Amino acid sequence: MEFYASLKSIAMHVPSERVKNAEFQQFLDTSDEWIEKRTGIKERRFASNEEKSSDLGVIAAKQAIERAHLTPKDIDLVVVATLSPDFLAMPSTACVLSAKLGIENKPAFDISAACTGFIYLLSVAKAYVESGMCENVLIVGAEKTSSVLDFKDRGTCILFGDGAGACVIGRTKRLKESILDVQISANGNFSNYLYTPRTLKPTPFNSKEEALEPFLCMKGNEVFKLAVKTLLKDVETILEKNALKPEDVRLFIPHQANFRIIQAVREHLDFKDEQVVLTVHKYGNTSAASIPMAMCEAYEEGRLKKGDLMLLDAFGGGLTWGSALVYFGG
């Protein structure tokens, strides 16, 4: 191989509006203590009515491109992961975001892998770069999860937040600046554990109407148990496959869904506190944006430096899951 795929830059953006747990008490049977005890979340950000996922994503994307010392014209491919796209079916949020960046005549498409979206993005970008098809790939996890939440359901609406994270994936000849390994998987037999239904209206050819509201639905207890079991196995597998141990990893950056899930994986694998990046208390579950946002915070705080090895893992609707070993090449 002449070169490897490398994570060249990272950036993030969140809306300005902070929503603290206590604000949910105004319309739900809940409390700050109840939410924080069960999730570790203290607050989250919600976008305005005018903002869409692409608006959040484009701000992060511009900064990621600048940090990679590139211009939008240098980007060969744009891929967006989101469960809250700007439009229901088309155009893709990646196409909308590309236009806002001034990128024309370059491929752009979305990935639907829910909270595992960023790991899927890494897999796609790595393949495109290492095959020689692209030199610079822009990947963006952008979420306005508040647009798909039922604010009458305290089991879901308290968990999520809005935000975006973006990375530029380029080339390197150095293994220790590369995306070392990515593994992704899915099992559609559990698709009813976490999903967003679509309302079907009657037509002249079909009188049946499904009056389901298009809000995120989740079997919380089942998802929690399966997430912990699956992530433990997945992380152990990728470490063993690459002859690595937890102490070889500079930072463990898991999907920020729930502090209890993160803690269960951390304790089982014996990661030290200083190895683990946590942002769930500040932003809640930002789905496909959570890992790049957490990565960016670590970078901006000086915890993540060039050549550092990161272990990433995520679990989401589909059900989907994945993990990655990534040397920071920025």
UniProtKB/Swiss-Prot annotation:
GO molecular function, one term: 3-oxoacyl-[acyl-carrier-protein] synthase activity
A Pfam family assignment: ACP_syn_III_C
List of catalytic residues: 115, 255, 285
Segments for region (ACP-binding): 256-260
Enzyme Commission number(s) of this protein: 2.3.1.180
Alphabetical keyword list: Acyltransferase, Cytoplasm, Fatty acid biosynthesis, Fatty acid metabolism, Lipid biosynthesis, Lipid metabolism, Multifunctional enzyme, Transferase
UniProt-listed InterPro entries: ACP_syn_III_C, ACP_syn_III_N, FabH, Thiolase-like
CC annotations in GO: cytoplasm
GO aspect biological process, one term: secondary metabolite biosynthetic process
Gene3D superfamilies per record: 3.40.47.10
Domain notes: The last Arg residue of the ACP-binding site is essential for the weak association between ACP/AcpP and FabH.
Subunit structure: Homodimer.
Family (UniProt): Belongs to the thiolase-like superfamily. FabH family.
Chain's role: Catalyzes the condensation reaction of fatty acid synthesis by the addition to an acyl acceptor of two carbons from malonyl-ACP. Catalyzes the first condensation reaction which initiates fatty acid synthesis and may therefore play a role in governing the total rate of fatty acid production. Possesses both acetoacetyl-ACP synthase and acetyl transacylase activities. Its substrate specificity determines the biosynthesis of branched-chain and/or straight-chain of fatty acids.
Protein name: Beta-ketoacyl-[acyl-carrier-protein] synthase III
Organism whose genome encodes this protein: Helicobacter pylori (strain HPAG1)
High-level lineage: Bacteria, Pseudomonadati, Campylobacterota, Epsilonproteobacteria, Campylobacterales
